[in-house]
């Protein structure tokens, strides 16, 4: 992560005097140059602001892991630029455009999906703003100097997402290699996950999430593997090919929804689809996208996270004879498993940690202080829920800084 972030920050940002300064370009238009300077389809100088928000959100996470201020400062610069350009939007325009010229500020173009190069529309719309919302949210929590502008941009984008994509299922483009319009599963299902993680902002969150999930199955469900009684997910409307990352993303969100709502409608297929997705990755980690070549980001990036989230939502899927952290409410900077001890450090004292363990621990400490096994609320505590094999350890409301240690 450090290598990737450092390389991009040194070789992929717009000029600080540009109309959109200090923003990461999504593509290297001179393929072997090692310099990111534009958009794969719309050319040199073109940014994708949604990817800038996603990159900055990952930089905040990296800052929390390393405590290196460089990543936080870079994330703040990107957030400042995004916030300054955020507008109200409407049914045809998102609060920030999908493509924009970093130097002139002009909105970029959508091109014909028939590879003619013909400009078909302005690239003023996408619904891939979940990471940007979380960027503003996390920077606000870090008490950033531009707190007010982050909060305002967060609210504007959130209200637009509620008013338009959530109602119309017009999710729009994401991928760099598609010239024109396409509705993408990643935009829709990532927002469904955002809703599940921010239920207080969505009074009808169950209906909202179910609506998105059903749209994805209706529009992008793939039935090629029906003989195995599993439906997997196509990538997008312009490229109706099943993807391992897209399928595992869908499954993880469906399992999160089931865990929080009690509605088990999607569980059986979700688990089968996760199993299907494993067949695209070899024992040594090679990933092969269906009917295509090796796409590294699809197999080594978000794909892995989907399985981690799936196991957190449905712990029975986690290995029963091993010890694993399934969930942390705070970013984990370090974790070590050794013999009769698990030791982890987090950015802030976590409200909740969840482990799948092979056997019940004898004790838990946080910051050197013993934490009691208790069902009482309002105190630091741990609870053991036995399973058929091993069990689930939940540690709650840790209010002291320092390492958490689980021992046997």
Go through each PLM region and give its residues:
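Glycan-recognition and catalytic cores of secretory/periplasmic carbohydrate-active enzymes
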Residues: 1-345
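Non-catalytic C-terminal accessory modules of carbohydrate-active enzymes
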Residues: 301-408
